[in-house]
Amino acid sequence: MNTNAHRYALTLDWTGNRGAGTSTYEGYSREHVVRISGKPDLVGSADPMFRGDPTLHNPEDLLLAALSQCHLLTYLALCARARINVLSYRDRAEGTLMLTKDGGGQFTEVVLRPEV
């Protein structure tokens, strides 16, 4: 394996079968568990507009979080290498998901607002 390649692995278990599987669109829960070895389990669901549990993280939350985290970590690394001392960092990120005619959707905008 190339030493520059980093592999990531997880197990995703759908836990939302209420007894009838996906026999109807309304009849199953969107709840699931993401398991990554050595880390706490992450219980997730769909966004409420897709019949998910509003108290759980959804893929859209996690995509926005991943973008914000990547920006933070890159910024901190660049500052450290340039001997710029960062004492605090907060990002108030927002994303816009546009629904498509077929019921799906796509992000059309992500705005990061870091405060250093």
Residue ranges of each PLM-predicted region?
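Extended beta-strand/beta-hairpin segments
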Residues: 1-65, 73-116
